[in-house]
Amino acid sequence: MGVYRIRVSTGDSVYAGSNNEVYLWLIGQHGEASLGKLFRPCRNSEAEFKVDVSEYLGPLLFVRVQKWHYLKEDAWFCNWISVKGPGDQGSEYTFPCYRWVQGTSILNLPEGTGCTVVEDSQGLFRNHREEELEERRSLYRWGNWKDGTILNVAATSISDLPVDQRFREDKRLEFEASQVLGTMDTVINFPKNTVTCWKSLDDFNYVFKSGHTKMAERVRNSWKEDAFFGYQFLNGANPMVLKRSTCLPARLVFPPGMEKLQAQLDEELKKGTLFEADFFLLDGIKANVILCSQQYLAAPLVMLKLQPDGQLLPIAIQLELPKTGSTPPPIFTPLDPPMDWLLAKCWVRSSDLQLHELQAHLLRGHLVAEVFAVATMRCLPSVHPVFKLLVPHLLYTMEINVRARSDLISERGFFDKVMSTGGGGHLDLLKQAGAFLTYSSLCPPDDLAERGLLDIDTCFYAKDALQLWQVMNRYVVGMFDLYYKTDQAVQDDYELQSWCQEITEIGLQGAQDRGFPTSLQSRAQACHFITMCIFTCTAQHSSIHLGQLDWFYWVPNAPCTMRLPPPKTKDATMEKLMATLPNPNQSTLQINVVWLLGRRQAVMVPLGQHSEEHFPNPEAKAVLKKFREELAALDKEIEIRNKSLDIPYEYLRPSLVENSVAI
């Protein structure tokens, strides 16, 4: 009983407002009241009004929302609704929404503090939780894009997605405008791309046009240098292949006359300074055929040594695995003729591009994040604190992945047109890479320890990833401790357990044999798992994504395809090198897609800076505030460090890390 002050916030995207009328009801623990027709929401605004309620409501639990139209449906994007009352001394309640209100269906928004099923001992939200999840499970269904790969949302086009998972208008316009620019550039450059082969490495400058970064310029000038080649395994676009050697790889069969190399490798191994990058996943993958022309793949092994000054130098490259009964493949070294050594390094760089895009970027970034997104929508109601914690980091992931499946890795998509793994090989590689997707590999403290990278002063990816993980983990623990006081509370939360099980057993297709948990038994284990989810959707994806425009724009440093087989003899010439590297048309397509995927986004939310307030309670706000302060401090620390580096490492600066997989 008394006067309630109502505030309603509408989103700022182009079509967030609505000409339709909005009706509201207040639902309290002891009663409910219809507020009637109140307003027509305007974009990027707050509506405020007071309503005299005659009923006694008690503590508020929900706001019920219904939009009504007479002639034309006009969707409304509601941010939140705030209610204070009764009277000026009454409590203030916030009801987060952050979704589209469509048609005339009724939407119940629970009060925003959030609670677990264990905390909801009176069952005040029980029916709402069950009804919301039932509706969500019908909207968000698992799909299987290709047999043998992890699951995805059941949507073959953007129109199949629930509207809340689609790009909002500003994001959509910016993304599609970039696609148009890339297509126009390909058409404009087509006449000069009709030649079948570049004549010299300098010819790649024809497609190295405006839009590149300062780092891409550095790559163009330094890509032949051995130290620069080795640096990329530590801090380049794909720092996920390198590991410290604990023994000489079994595949490393030395041809006659290479006893000195073997002795050198043994010596580096004893000192603990021997490292390897093994691209064995590419072995046996069928190479693409582009415009009736056979393309080629290799499965290189690179052996590198760590110098006292921190430089990582390549000392041996084997391009193919030995075959039983065949002559061992050649091992290339820096002592070989310069053209042979350069060609071998080009093969490694091409192989690294294939694994980067398919394993490190698509699988470990996009597809795994999509599993988290679908499972979260299916298993955690909006009132659940873990839903509130995760949902800002799942924004736009489903749509960007639908676009990837329809434009990039589909039949006649980008991979088929220009990548040596296209034409079906990319699907086989995804399946093989999925078999090596372990839980520990998604957790930097475990992954970096397993790969022996924690004590390398010049591995800035490792340093920044570990620090960022620790900041995220403290944030997750801070939020988690507000809602789970004991390990038993974790075990008794059947929604949380169902979510974890659905990720591991269904989305990741039985990943428990690769270390993923099917249940969460303690607060520490749950926080580790949730930190892994957030890190994967933010920092890990950005560490792989942000380097594309730097490292892949100069085509010889990351050839999208190779047009001659891997060399079996050491007799390379410039003509052979140029006949192997991508032709003009392939080069143009590569840099256009690299620009589209790797450019800095005009519509981008930095890590932790989401405007949505899913936790309106002061305790949770304090945890988020501390998280943002720690991110700002780490960002400043990295900025200061980078000033003293010859090559700044910025891919894990919190201000550049995107808050979700949205590109």
UniProtKB/Swiss-Prot annotation:
Its cofactor is Fe cation. It comes from Mus musculus. Induction: Up-regulated in response to endoplasmic reticulum stress (at protein level). Its EC number is 1.13.11.31, 1.13.11.33, 1.13.11.-, 1.13.11.12. This is Polyunsaturated fatty acid lipoxygenase ALOX15. The gene is Alox15. GO terms for biological process: apoptotic cell clearance; arachidonate metabolic process; bone mineralization; cellular response to calcium ion; cellular response to interleukin-13; fatty acid oxidation; hepoxilin biosynthetic process; linoleic acid metabolic process. PANTHER family: LIPOXYGENASE. GO terms for molecular function: arachidonate 12(S)-lipoxygenase activity; arachidonate 15-lipoxygenase activity; iron ion binding; linoleate 13S-lipoxygenase activity; phosphatidylinositol-4,5-bisphosphate binding. Fe cation binds at residues 361, 366, 541, 545, 663. Interacts with PEBP1; in response to IL13/interleukin-13, prevents the interaction of PEBP1 with RAF1 to activate the ERK signaling cascade. Binds 1 Fe cation per subunit. Signal peptide: none annotated. The PLAT domain can bind calcium ions; this promotes association with membranes. SUPFAM superfamilies: Lipase/lipooxygenase domain (PLAT/LH2 domain) (SSF49723), Lipoxigenase (SSF48484). Pfam families: Lipoxygenase, PLAT. Found in pituitary and pineal glands as well as leukocytes, kidney, aorta, small intestine and cornea. Also expressed by resident peritoneal macrophages (at protein level).
